[in-house]
Swiss-Prot record:
The record marks K159 as: Lowers pKa of active site Cys. Pathway: Protein modification; protein lipoylation via endogenous pathway; protein N(6)-(lipoyl)lysine from octanoyl-[acyl-carrier-protein]. It comes from the Bacteria. This is Octanoyl-[GcvH]:protein N-octanoyltransferase. One of its GO terms (biological process) is protein modification process. It catalyses: N(6)-octanoyl-L-lysyl-[glycine-cleavage complex H protein] + L-lysyl-[lipoyl-carrier protein] = N(6)-octanoyl-L-lysyl-[lipoyl-carrier protein] + L-lysyl-[glycine-cleavage complex H protein]. Disulfide bonds: none annotated. Belongs to the octanoyltransferase LipL family.
Length: 283
């Protein structure tokens, strides 16, 4: 399986997988928006960014409309998790030291990239990356998972990853979270309790997922071997190279930091608004 979007002449690699507990998920959303702007303006090659955040639950805008959201968020914080509202769609997901996030950032200046194309590119990359482990990766909604979607990635019917997209100023960010190690069911149980406390049996206009923890697992659980974030990083870079592109390491540059500051201010304001300000006192 391959995809033309993966055949970039150069890939700019930005690895932020070892920044530690002070690295806030809000920073990642602002960084991806800044990189989308740079790539869309033709000031950067295509980007592959890898990132890890410790003990964070990222909510979608719809999650903040739960009738008992205050109690649900208090529960997450008591369990030791930061709570962040993302700047795009989707629903609640768990990030921790065993979850690898990957962003592929493409320019949309010459040719329009259909939404389906973005998803298919990430699916193709993951299928190729995991083929060496003997895994057959499938794409399709896994009912009972958290943040369900038509591009849930699964092995043997158990979800280990979810894909999303964001488009900013001519740049397209295709993002995936990969549950590399740890318990997929334990992560799902956390989100099941979040929705249980957030709804408390009330009917809601939005159809929140009824999470079934047993339909989710980590790659380590599914493949029967203990995988590390670093091992998956090497597999990712080797797989990208196999599509013919040159990879080089990089960090954000001066102009990108200026854009980052703007997007950071927006995401902070969004979180203060979505979480009604006083909820942030727990962070």
């Amino acid at each position: 399986m391959s995809h033309e979007l993966l055949r970039q002449p150069k890939w700019r690699v930005i690895d932020q997988s070892h920044f530690g507990p002070l690295f806030d998920a809000k920073q990642s959303f602002a960084i991806d928006d800044a990189l989308c702007t740079a790539v869309g303006a033709g000031q950067s090659d295509a980007v592959v960014r890898t990132w890890v955040h410790e003990n964070t639950v990222v909510l979608g805008a719809a999650d903040t409309k739960l009738p008992y959201i205050d109690e649900a968020i208090s529960f997450l914080r008591q369990e030791g998790y930061r709570v962040v509202v993302r700047n795009s769609g989707g629903l609640a997901v768990v990030l921790d030291s065993g979850v690898l996030n990957i962003s592929l950032i493409f320019p949309e200046t010459k040719n329009t990239i259909a939404i389906e194309q973005g998803y298919e590119a990430m699916y193709a990359l993951m299928a190729a990356m995991l083929a060496s482990y003997g895994a057959r990766v499938e794409a399709g909604e896994i009912v009972g998972s958290y943040c369900p979607g038509s591009y849930d990635l699964s092995i043997g019917g158990k979800k280990f990853a979810g894909i999303s997209q964001r488009r900013v100023r001519g740049g397209v960010a295709v993002q995936i979270y990969l549950c590399v190690n740890g318990s997929g069911a334990a992560r799902a149980e956390l989100i099941r309790r979040f929705y249980e406390l957030g709804r408390q049996g009330e009917k809601t206009k939005f159809a929140y997922p009824d999470v079934v923890p047993t339909v989710m697992a980590s790659l380590s659980e599914l493949l029967g071997c203990e995988l590390s974030i670093d091992e998956l990083l090497v597999a990712l870079w080797r797989t990208l190279q196999s599509f013919g592109g040159e990879l080089y390491s990089s960090a954000l540059e001066n102009g990108e930091w200026n854009w980052y500051e703007q997007y950071w201010a927006r995401i902070v304001e969004r979180n203060e608004t979505a979480l009604k300000g006083e909820l942030l006192a727990g962070e």
